[in-house]
């Protein structure tokens, strides 16, 4: 292999890589039309929402390195915002937008004190805030309290509409993530993650940057919550505000490949599909599985599935 | 020709207490534009503390710091960048998971004259790498660089923020003799291109050979200030720091 | 409010502070020596509670004694966990993300083990002592709370003694204050860290056992206390027992007196409100003040 053939091979790889998201999008957009299976549609719908929250979390946790255990707050706020607005007669799509805004505002309330803490302290603070919000929402009257809240939608239930809404949301999230990654915003986040003080020494304002990415991530997660609420037509604090929701949101990008663009997508798909299977067959061990997975990933392959795959690929290439 | 512009750095009676101990006491000095201004002092003299206060890492207990007439006392580092003051680190702090070019690119994006476009920022970053003499390392991971190159990366990164004043924290620490003289040449080039340099150093020979003006600290107070020749022959300085007869530049 | 009522509340707060303190020292020791934020602390507290429950129900051992008996068992478990898992983490002078996620994963595993072994119904340790009351003048105190408080003080006292009068304790304090210097003077980091980790887990179990006498629990037990431990650590500083005591006292006072204004369900929100307030008034909390001091280098 001479130099020019390596360059050409590299260009070919690059073209594959930029075509991949579009190919995937097309495949997913067409599949419900080609394969008629309501179960598959439902599975993919849920997976798209997971992918969205996974990508969103990764913006803050992967790019900026701020690990939050409290994303259920935004998911739940989004869910309840959409639910309340729809019951007041608002069209779902503006309601989703309102969910994004509410979630982003809440992220400010959380972030302004919490980002004064660094690293793990921030993480624990998010656990507490998330729990505090759940407690408050469980006790609140007009949202139905602990017994939950029902959405009444006076339109026929069209599964495909939900499907494409969720797919669009996931696509938007992916686009945002890909654009941010190599632009000024993304570099600033990476700098903060790698050395916050050195980043400040070259002009990055860590506090406002963290607040900004937090708001973006929260907004995306809030819309996901809203889309879920509309689909499910019934939500309750133990579910959408539950700690396990925060855990799942965090697990996906870590499993898939934290800090990358495709990692959260991979993690979202793996999680969505595996969760369906596990919850069906072995409901009592799913914490065990996720906990062990997390431990194994941290100790042996911090780059997650994507990291492991890259290593294998490189070794394979090296052998030629 | 007398420089009538406001000084690029004006430190006025700056003091820093840690508990009951004054690490820096009533230090005042000025740095004029277009100089290389150095300060030295024995261990514990308060050099690092003073540097940290100017670089925004510490707040003075009292006193004021000004740049071009504006009060910059206690400003955070990212604000100082916008005021045209950038620093290097004594123990290098590259962004280890980025390549050399990306390290500098960050600085270009967030410097005094920030550039938003990634392509344009990369261009400007290459320029900075060229000025620092490490453009050939642009695609290398920052973590594998030698100490000498990492120090140059610190400088390239700081320069990429378009500073009027560059604060160098013991930039020659850990360098070989020839690397040191190359580094000093680089500092002279930086000064000649219009950026003022303020330089804290342990290495007396380096400081005296490159600086236009030197300030000597001892026990947190200013002991002397003047040209290298003046400092080397000042008896108080000799007694406190240099010990015996000062080694001449030759 | 009468003086008697006020004093009652203060006494209540004091008793609570003792519990909170012993609950937090486990986390503090591990953090101080290894800069690891031990999220699995909650899981080990939960195990301690269940272990004490088992000893009480199967062997009719007094629950307080059972709590103390959990210490050696949990100490060994802690040592094992350190040997198998924690040791593999890279050493650091600052808390790292991988260590956080590792301990979190461990917590999930422990929770699940709890569910598998004991199911998800609430359990509690119920003895005649639970309902009885001690009268100090006009104030009546729940006996079990008083006993637990005394036990907590004993623990803290023992820990202080170990830290200040044993060779091991000195190594631990050396590592806490300056890891590199400690290594240079010959402290065996791995061995000391292993023992310190075991100690931290041991105290977690012990605290869990004591708490089990006061509150009902299920395998998710510990999350609320974990958060409180964190609030205490941020309030009082991370690296000294006296700091923990101060933080515990402040939190206990705030929580106890807040019952006058706010329904009991909102307790956790109060603790967090306190933390938020501290962070706004003292930006960065105490943890980042320490980080700022380190930044000088």
Language model segments and positions:
Chain A
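Cytosolic-side transmembrane-helix boundaries in multi-pass membrane proteins
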Residues: 1-29, 194, 200-208, 278-320
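Membrane-interfacial amphipathic/re-entrant helices at transmembrane-helix boundaries
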Residues: 1-52, 81, 88-89, 93-95, ...
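Alpha-helical transmembrane segments of multi-pass integral membrane proteins
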Residues: 27, 31-35, 108, 156-192, ...
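Single transmembrane alpha-helix segments in multi-pass membrane proteins
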Residues: 37-87, 112-122, 191, 196-200, ...
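Generic structural signal for small/hydrophobic residues in well-ordered secondary structure
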Residues: 44, 68, 81, 107, ...
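Transmembrane alpha-helical segments in multi-pass inner-membrane proteins
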Residues: 72, 211-300
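Alpha-helical transmembrane segments within multi-pass membrane transporters and channels
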Residues: 79, 89-131, 266-269
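Extracellular/periplasmic helix-loop junction at the C-terminal end of a transmembrane helix
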Residues: 126-159, 165, 186, 283, ...
